[in-house]
Amino acid sequence: GAFDENSVYINNVEVYRPLLVRSGQQEGLSAINPYMVDKIGFSTGGYAAKYGDKMSSALDITYKKLQPKGSKKTVTEGTLAASLLGADAYFGLGTKKLSWLNSIRYKTNSYLLGTTDTKAEYKPNFLDYQTYLSYCPNKRWKIDFIGNISDNHYNFVPHDRETTFGTQQDVKSFRVYFDGQEKDRFLTYFGTLGITRNITDKTSFSILGSAFYSKEQEKYDIQGQYWLDQTETSENLGVGTYFEHARNYLTARVLSAKAILKHKTKKHDIEVAYTYKKEHISENSVEYEMRDSAGYSVPHNGKDLYMIYSMKARNTLDANRMEAYLQDTYRFTSQGGHSHFTLNYGVRMSHWSLNKETLFSPRISLGIIPAYSENTTLRFAAGLYYQAPFFKELRDTSTVNGITYATLNEKIKSPRSIHFIAGYDYRFRINNQRYRFTAEAYYKALGNLIPYSVNNVKVVYYGENRASGHAAGIDLKLYGEFVPGTDSWLTFSLMNTQMKLNGKGVPLPTDQRFAVNLFFTDYFPGTERWRMSLKLALADGLPFSTPHRELETNTFRAPAYKRADIGMSYRLLDNSKGTKKSIFKNIW
């Protein structure tokens, strides 16, 4: 699915991402801090009713709590890291009642951007601070707080670019000289406060309040003068100029309150929740692109002066959203107790005040550990999922006198997806080394789709329900100790996703037909202090079309994606048993 079709949760609270980001160069640090993560749950389909109204996948992150073991009263841990791409610092403190994690991260990818075809002054600076405080005064009460501040700056002053393309017999050269600059800023605040009361050992009630605020601006004025030449003959094929301008400003604020009631019995885990959200988004955007070819502004009709692209948007969204779900996890065995079953079933309901739409989403999944093998797990899931619109999906465009105006379509409906999932999991040993093989096949019937195009990481929607389609595939993964004491894995995926738009079959922008990934770790001979990690990736290219064109022109496909990463680490201190030792004894 697209970026907006995947839900991300941190400690039961949904996380949002910036709305104006258009390129990977502008993207900063992930909202998920890897130093603070305890558990990760991910599902590509057939997920439970407690996960929100997204129709592709759900990522559930739980931050860790530090607690001393045994007779210790406190425990601390920390990390310092530095590289050509930035620096990180993390510190955690834990007592019997309190756990406090703090992390600050800084990233700059100017070193990598300097290797691209476009020679420029890249000054991206991304700063992120996160804190997680958990306090348990007694066994009945728990208070959690998560705070996050993210300040991302992207400054770009291009100089020139030269690209060659064509065949061996017909090589062409494209040169551009630039004037101007780009200045962007994405400032985000996120916070959540949760209070949990354990009514009994089997029943708990939680209240969570969260706030998300984002202030974004994207400003650029860049002129490019280009030459297109035939390389072999040095013949000039064309000259021209283009000018790109943007003044985009956006402010987003989402406040939410959530109540969760959980109750456990011998065979059932029942969970019910209600969420109320208040959303406010304001946008003021102006973009245009002028192209001059041989002294004529394109497009040229001999009468009026038009831009190749011009867009204006001044929109405000004020809406309330209500969500509720009820789910139960029922565990039982067959007669004789040889086969074990886990049945999760539930229903999710949501209502949005903007389009007056009420959605019901039933979901069910069944996990089976068959009698013939306790190392085998079978999983089947099905459900009806909706992609509740947020902001970008609402933006509908109309063109008047060569100018495109973006307005909000308040009558839009939620796209839907019907999931059918079948999975297989088998754990085994070879030479007393652990291995795990998983396979999953899925089919998703898509309806009421809002078509969208992707340019880099910017997603632009049509603003109307105009298509239907499907997504299908199979994922295979082998995980295990290829080398004793290390973890490695190999994955292989086959995928296909298409939609029917205006009577024509069109691949969705996410139609990546295959992918192969390998992660391998090994020790250096004679020592376990030195460790090497190797990661290889090969994936099919994604479909694309020329800018500002209809999706029906998605006739191009990018080359296959290839990547190799290698890393090495050396363990200075070996204190895995937790005993106090001299630092020098550990090193030498």
Q: Where do the language-model regions lie?
A:
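Structural signature of Gram-negative outer-membrane beta-barrels, strongest in the C-terminal barrel
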Residues: 252-254, 267, 275, 312-444, ...
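Face-selective signature of the C-terminal outer-membrane beta-barrel domain
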Residues: 136-152, 181-355, 438-441, 489
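Membrane-embedded beta-barrel scaffold of Gram-negative outer-membrane proteins
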Residues: 206-210, 411-465, 470, 588
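Conserved C-terminal beta-signal and adjacent last beta-strands/turns
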Residues: 92, 134, 418-420, 494, ...
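Periplasmic-side early beta-strands and strand-to-turn transitions of outer-membrane beta-barrels
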Residues: 68, 94-184, 220, 448
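Gram-negative outer-membrane beta-barrel transporters
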Residues: 336-337, 442-445, 462-545
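N-terminal periplasmic accessory domains that precede
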Residues: 9, 24-30, 45, 50-77
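Short acidic/polar hinge/loop motifs at secondary-structure boundaries
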Residues: 14-42
